């Protein structure tokens, strides 16, 4: 089974957590695109979706799924999204696609967070994948200096502007032993919008695509 086939298996497995007549939170990325394809098969049974990115919104609309503004929604039953890394405590690094802030907002509103990945994303310690940090443009250099003080090696992601009009610093060489503490520390830096650690609000269910099928992990 190829990596993309494992992603597809995880994406389709998430459909079992979608209830009829609900609004579904939809993340961003290659694995989520498989989930959106699956969600389209029951588009007449759900109210619609809230999307975390312009890219996912475009795909949802193309497949005939109504997309709601989050401000018009009180509650999202489930939020389905991928991860760049996830540990055994369901802490994640996300944001490789630069949609981390909107992903974090939608996750905060959702009752349950279903994380869908292939088995290459499971790690014992977060940090081998560079940690994305969304930053107000005028604060980029200051935030970079502060991230160095925290032990990281920040690199400006050239040519990338987020859906919110901000920039991304990718922080390399951080072995993140306490994700909750590090998430809070980075978010406290003036000029940071948010960072790609999802630890204070981690996943509730992890669906892992493997060569032998999909493994379901809960805490």
UniProtKB/Swiss-Prot annotation:
Its EC number is 5.3.1.6. One of its GO terms (molecular function) is ribose-5-phosphate isomerase activity. GO terms for cellular component: cytosol. InterPro entries: NagB/RpiA_transferase-like, Ribose5P_isomerase_typA_subgr, Ribose5P_isomerase_type_A. Keywords: Isomerase. GO terms for biological process: D-ribose metabolic process; pentose-phosphate shunt, non-oxidative branch. The active site is at 103 (proton acceptor). Pfam families: Rib_5-P_isom_A. Coiled coil: none annotated. Substrate binds at residues 28-31, 81-84, 94-97, 121. It comes from the Bacteria. Transmembrane segments: none annotated. Pathway: Carbohydrate degradation; pentose phosphate pathway; D-ribose 5-phosphate from D-ribulose 5-phosphate (non-oxidative stage): step 1/1. Catalyzes the reversible conversion of ribose-5-phosphate to ribulose 5-phosphate. Homodimer. Belongs to the ribose 5-phosphate isomerase family. NCBIfam families: PRK00702.1, rpiA. This is Ribose-5-phosphate isomerase A. It comes from Shewanella frigidimarina (strain NCIMB 400). The gene is rpiA.
